[in-house]
Amino acid sequence: MAKYKITKTDEYYTYELPAHNECKLTRLHDPADVEGGKLILSRSHFLPAGGGTDFSTNAAESIYYVAKGKLLFKGEDGQETLLEEGDSVHIAANSPKCVTNVGVETAIMLVILL
């Protein structure tokens, strides 16, 4: 395996997931490039006024990082937390959660699956 691999923006690919509304998802690297294929880095663009996800789970641990905008994070316990630019949240595997864009601009979130 190479010691490093550069991925240019024209090499990214977009995809859709059923639980995501008004959301553009972009995979930022090929998971096969990571030893063991266990790390996935994606970027989510949530449109203003309600773009987001339904409650969903991931089989892997996740880290969400808000790169731009304001997102309302809700965990399975119903607690809501406003996430703003620079905030992050660690999510245990198989934990239900959802996020909603509550700002007036497109929100951008980096998603790291471990």
Predicted feature residues:
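A short hydrophobic beta-strand segment most commonly corresponding to one strand
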Residues: 44, 63, 90, 104-114
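Surface loops and adjacent helix of pleckstrin homology
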Residues: 76-78, 102, 112
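A short, N-terminal "cap"/entry segment at the start of jelly-roll beta-barrel domains
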Residues: 1-38
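Conserved short histidine dyad/triad with adjacent acidic residue
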Residues: 27-30, 40-58, 80, 93-96
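A generic structural motif
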Residues: 61, 68, 78, 94-96, ...
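Short, conserved beta-strand element in jelly-roll/cupin
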Residues: 45-47, 57-73
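Short acidic-glycine-tyrosine-enriched beta hairpin
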Residues: 77-93
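Short beta-strand His + acidic residue motifs that chelate non-heme Fe in jelly-roll/DSBH
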Residues: 53-55, 73-74, 91, 96-104
